[in-house]
């Protein structure tokens, strides 16, 4: 496997596809390398339809949990609710015969959970057969962290606790939360330690997700990984962008390799996140960085079947066939039914609208259908709109690539004086008084 540093990599390397290629050439059409002026290699995947059968990846162990496929669904506000997670799991089971990955609930605020905010409790809904149940906490305060994690343990609310230190949204960072917080090393360590202490003596692992740093001048991921491991985290996951990048440009996978190398003696897995839009991307990331698993976010928007493809790619099995438009219409209808069961029919249909453009990307459907779906209000109305396409054998054209929000890089909004003292463990004022879900 390649580890990208400031030095050039070796002349050749085995890929997860079993090929050996010189570094100046793409591996099996899946990989290209850019060389920045700074002297840093940035590796990233190219879109490819090639169904490479991978050398099987090792199962991923996160504390007491073992995942046959080292794949995690990233928490996404307003997306990874019980309806979407159920749909992803159904697709994996239907196409691969079992559910092998970890599907994480959308982020909830620790304080809102402890105070039993109605919206927050609704967001923590899990399906009866969902196992393991994974819940992500947003927190900036060790006190609320401990209380929330203890509540999860005492009330059997989840089997896994993840912690969000990766959100780059200005309304979060301006209060010292999300991707701003790991800069405060002592406070960060206190928060992780609080969650681990609350889960002590149980089978509930605590994991931590963070970014490369605030910006290129304030990278925090190496310290964050070391501190998280020292405080008892069972795994860490790195989104290979800074907060300043938000979701723009390309993720710098070489930073995942740096973190993996930095944490080689920690004994805990390092997962990579950023720009996984196809199954081949996951294999490429693991090959290039040596990471132990992948976390997938925007790439699955409108593609809940992606997790079946990822499971196939990373366990050495043939990829399932690409779904036709007819099959996708049935998946859309199922998604709507699940949303209606969770939110009620009217609210559920409104929630579906934002998924429509993602589902239909690359398919030959007219503007009329897209407009009708953007106004859908009942399940019957939805079925009527989809019916003319239910037998369509059409396949999506060029459906891979970036999905969801991308935007532009920008200056990170921080509390006044935030960068003055990284050892300051003062809890930022008012940061935990937020609605769950971002």
Give residue ranges: language-model regions.
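Hydrophobic faces of well-ordered beta-strands that scaffold small-molecule active sites
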Residues: 71-74, 103-105, 133-137, 161, ...
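Alpha/beta enzyme core
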Residues: 150-161, 165-175, 186-268
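Glycine-rich, positively charged N-terminal anion/phosphate-binding segment
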Residues: 51-61, 76-155
């Amino acid at each position: 496997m390649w580890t990208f540093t400031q030095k050039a990599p070796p002349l050749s390397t085995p890929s997860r596809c079993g090929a050996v290629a010189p570094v100046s050439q793409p591996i099996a059409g899946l990989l290209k390398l850019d060389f920045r002026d700074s002297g840093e290699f940035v590796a990233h995947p190219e879109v490819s339809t090639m169904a490479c059968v991978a050398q099987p990846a090792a199962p991923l162990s996160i504390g007491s949990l073992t995942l046959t496929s080292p794949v995690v669904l990233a928490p996404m506000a307003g997306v990874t609710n019980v309806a979407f997670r159920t749909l992803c799991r159904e697709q994996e089971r239907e196409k691969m015969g079992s559910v092998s990955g970890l599907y994480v609930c959308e982020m909830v605020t620790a304080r809102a959970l402890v105070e039993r905010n109605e919206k927050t409790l609704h967001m923590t809904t899990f399906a009866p057969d969902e196992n393991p149940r994974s819940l992500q906490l947003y927190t900036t305060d060790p006190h609320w962290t401990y209380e929330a994690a203890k509540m999860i343990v005492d009330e059997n609310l989840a089997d896994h606790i993840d912690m969000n230190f990766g959100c780059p949204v200005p309304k979060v960072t301006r209060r010292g939360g999300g991707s701003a917080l790991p800069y405060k090393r002592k406070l960060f360590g206190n928060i992780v330690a609080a969650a681990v202490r609350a889960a002590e003596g149980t089978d509930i692992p605590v994991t931590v997700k963070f970014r490369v740093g605030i910006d290129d001048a304030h990278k925090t991921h190496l310290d964050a990984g070391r501190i998280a491991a020292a405080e008892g985290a069972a795994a860490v996951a790195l989104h290979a962008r800074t907060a300043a990048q938000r979701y723009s440009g390309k993720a710098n996978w070489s930073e995942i390799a740096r973190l993996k190398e930095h944490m080689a003696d920690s004994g805990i897995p390092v997962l990579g996140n950023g720009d996984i839009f196809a199954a081949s991307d996951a294999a490429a990331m693991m090959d290039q960085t040596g990471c132990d698993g992948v976390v997938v976010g925007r790439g699955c928007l409108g593609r809940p079947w992606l997790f079946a493809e990822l499971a196939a790619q990373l366990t050495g099995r043939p990829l399932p066939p690409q779904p036709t438009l007819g099959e996708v219409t049935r998946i859309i209808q199922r998604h709507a039914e699940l949303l209606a069961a969770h939110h009620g029919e009217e609210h559920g249909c409104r929630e579906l609208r934002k998924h429509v453009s993602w589902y239909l990307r690359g398919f030959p459907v007219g503007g009329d259908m897209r407009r009708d779906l953007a106004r859908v209000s009942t399940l019957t109305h939805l079925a009527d709109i989809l019916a003319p396409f239910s037998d369509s054998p059409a396949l999506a054209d060029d459906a891979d690539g970036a999905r969801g929000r991308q935007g532009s890089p920008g200056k990170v909004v921080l509390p006044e004086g935030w960068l003055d003292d990284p050892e300051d463990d003062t809890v930022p004022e008012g940061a935990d008084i937020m609605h769950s879900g971002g």
